[in-house]
From Swiss-Prot:
This is Serine/threonine-protein kinase hal4. Residues 140-155, 234-261 have a biased composition (Low complexity). It catalyses: L-seryl-[protein] + ATP = O-phospho-L-seryl-[protein] + ADP + H(+); L-threonyl-[protein] + ATP = O-phospho-L-threonyl-[protein] + ADP + H(+). GO terms for cellular component: cytosol. Residues 1-167, 181-261 are annotated as: Disordered. The keyword Manganese does not apply. Its main location: cytoplasm. It holds the Pfam family Pkinase. Belongs to the protein kinase superfamily. Ser/Thr protein kinase family. Promotes K(+) uptake, by the potassium transporter trk1-trk2, which leads to the subsequent cellular resistance to toxic cations such as Na(+), Li(+) and Ca(2+).
């Protein structure tokens, strides 16, 4: 039989099998054509002869197989390259059609070397890789290459050997295949198909973006409370100090006993009541251990010092000169304000300052530990805020600023307002404000750790916040800098307003009308729009606006906008447009209850004249229906 007849027999078997398995390997025709201009030589057949060229094969193969571009290799290599795809006798998947008919998708430039690439057009069956070992060398024999099924399902697949700028490893090639198939109009650079990202292109529609940003599915920490038992949120497995977080924000328990979980941040019971268990930060836990070790070491040290002092006093009891020197020194210290004496007075009243637990723009907050030996060694913790002078601030302005803040905060007595105890000047001449310690941290840290809060949890904190703001306004004080960082929490969930550095007294006790104010202060996302104008405004309305933004931050874990200026923030501009429409503003419309949504629209009214007051908010149906925790009701 001649070589032409042998080749005809091979072609007939290809046509009859329809890309089926080949049981025999006929002898390939010897070629006299010179090798292609490539450093790689064409592979040989098992008998040592060179394989037939692709052009010779194409002349005798039926037109339906023209889309399969074969590199010079033996037919056994072709059969083994499609290990499962050819042996399974499954029909090809429907090819992916390009957006333009008969258009080549991600086609690389032509090459003189037939082993450079194997590609297919968008309206033809997918290409089959001729050499499985070239791209799947790590796969065991008999396994399916990851790209085999992908190539048959996605007719736009293109396999390119390794070169600069082109992915050649199997994992990267699979991602590239999926990316090209998903893209309707992939770009084709001059050096081959460019890698296409699998990430969906963000929509330019602002409404779609708002849905994506504020949707519950986009929040990293999901809420999934099921069952009728106690809903437990934020178990102990959650790492609140950063890094990867395991588990969701909410886990369910089939029992109403919260002790069944290791630790739960927020627990809801069958009777609709709830409890907060805000664990102190790890830094505070470390501080507590350090304080215990410190006290244990100090007690031993004090005992040694007492014994040494008694021994020294025994030696000097008979010395009149030493007695006179000691008395003279005490009189001199009493005649002047010695920094050491001031410091000793502070330590005597509130203990020694320890680790820094908070930092601000012009000061730090430390923790002070006081042991009362007369009361069975009871321990009391205080928060000490150390004020620093601003750059180019005179001593007179510095003193006036601190005394003004202290006068405002020390005159307030409310469960939701921080209790300020004292203002003392330390040995360096800086003033220190002593306050009660809230070991639960601040609201900002809680939101950052949880992603977002549970609806009942956020409602409880919001009602406590509005109750404190209503009290401040009744006392004639506006805070002017409300934000989650200035809202402290106890371990049991009691919220307290702090930092009255920007506070204003808009009405004296004997006055009935409130004084208007002007000027810009606070943090940008919480500043009301009227503060950017040059006209005067009511400072109470500014506090109400900030409370609305804080509530949305608790529910969504995000800011509604960067700045409440229509010309500078597209999200705020979209809010002004959507709040007039029937569909409403998407982040607010995602909230479940209509009473909550309506109240928030009135809290965030751009015109302060029509904005709700704190007292009106407390009397609204939504806020009256909110159930507070036991700690939130304490002290009322």
């Amino acid at each position: 039989m001649g070589e032409k007849d042998k080749l005809h027999e091979i072609s007939s078997k290809f046509a009859s099998l329809g890309l089926g398995s080949l049981k025999s390997t006929p002898k390939a025709r010897e070629t006299t054509e010179p090798p292609p201009p490539s450093s790689q030589q064409p592979p040989s057949t098992p008998n040592g002869k060179e394989a037939a060229s692709p052009s010779a094969l194409k002349q005798n193969v039926r037109p339906s197989l023209n889309s399969v571009q074969q590199t010079p290799a033996s037919i056994d290599a072709v059969a083994s390259s499609s290990n499962v795809s050819l042996q399974s006798q499954q029909p090809l998947s429907k090819p992916v059609v390009s957006s333009k008919p008969n258009q080549t998708t991600a086609m690389p430039p032509p090459s003189n070397n037939p082993s450079r690439h194997v590609s297919s057009t968008s309206n033809k069956p997918a290409a089959v890789s001729p050499n499985p070992a070239a791209h799947h060398a790590e796969l065991p024999s008999g396994s399916v290459p990851p790209s085999a099924s992908v190539s048959r399902a996605n007719s736009t697949a293109t396999t390119t050997p390794h070169k600069a700028g082109v992915v050649s490893n199997p994992a990267a090639a699979n991602v590239h295949v999926l990316s090209v198939a998903a893209s309707p109009n992939p770009s084709t650079p001059s050096n081959g198909p460019a890698p296409v990202s699998t990430t969906a292109t963000p929509s330019r529609n602002p409404v779609t973006r708002l849905q994506r940003i504020f949707s519950q599915n986009s929040v990293s920490r999901q809420n999934s409370r099921t069952g009728r038992g106690a809903a437990v949120a934020n178990t102990e497995e959650t790492n609140s100090t950063g890094g990867s977080e395991t588990g969701g924000a909410a886990n369910s328990s089939s029992t109403s006993n919260p002790s069944s979980a290791k630790w739960s941040r927020f627990t809801v019971y069958d009777d609709a009541s709830h409890t907060h268990q805000l664990r102190p930060a790890r830094r505070q836990e470390k501080l507590g251990k350090m304080l215990k070790d410190f006290l244990a070491g100090n007690s031993k040290k004090r005992e040694e010092e007492r014994i040494a002092k008694e021994a020294a006093d025994a030696q000097h009891q008979l010395s009149l000169v030493q007695s006179w020197i000691n008395g003279y020194g005490q009189e001199k210290l009493a005649d002047k304000k010695d920094p050491a004496k001031v410091s000793a007075s502070f330590v005597e009243k509130y203990g020694r300052c320890q680790e820094v637990i908070g930092r601000g723009a012009f000061g730090v907050v430390r923790i002070a530990h006081k042991v009362d030996p007369q009361n069975s060694g009871s321990e009391t913790l205080y928060a000490v805020k150390e004020f620093r002078r601003k750059p180019a601030e005179s001593q007179k302005k510095y003193t006036k600023r601190l005394t003004s803040e202290f006068c405002i905060s020390s005159s307030l007595r409310h469960p939701n307002v921080i209790h300020t105890l004292d203002l003392i000047q330390d040995g360096k001449g800086d003033y220190c404000e002593v306050m009660e310690l809230c070991s639960g941290g601040d609201l900002y840290t809680l939101i950052m750790a949880a992603g977002r809060l549970e609806p009942m949890e956020a409602d409880c904190f919001f009602k406590q916040l509005m109750r404190g703001v209503d009290y401040l306004h009744d006392m004639g004080v506006a805070h002017r800098d409300l934000k989650p960082e200035n809202l402290l929490l106890t371990v049991s969930g009691s919220l307290k307003i702090t930092d009255f550095g920007n506070g204003e007294c808009f009405r004296m006790a004997w006055e009935k009308e409130a004084h208007m104010t002007c000027g810009l202060c606070g943090s940008a996302p919480y500043i009301a729009p009227e503060e950017y104008t040059e006209s005067e405004f009511d400072p109470r309305a500014v506090d109400v606006w900030a409370c609305g933004v804080i509530y949305m931050a608790m529910r969504t874990g995000r800011h509604l906008w960067r700045v409440a200026k229509k010309s500078e923030d597209e999200y705020y501009s979209r809010y002004l447009m959507d709040r007039k429409n029937e569909s409403g503003y998407e982040p607010i419309e995602m909230l479940e209850r209509s009473r909550c949504r309506n109240t928030l629209y009135n809290i965030l009214h751009p015109n302060p004249t029509y904005r709700l007051t704190a007292k009106q908010i407390m009397k609204s149906e939504w806020v009256r229906s909110i159930t507070l925790c036991e700690a939130g009701n304490a002290g009322l």
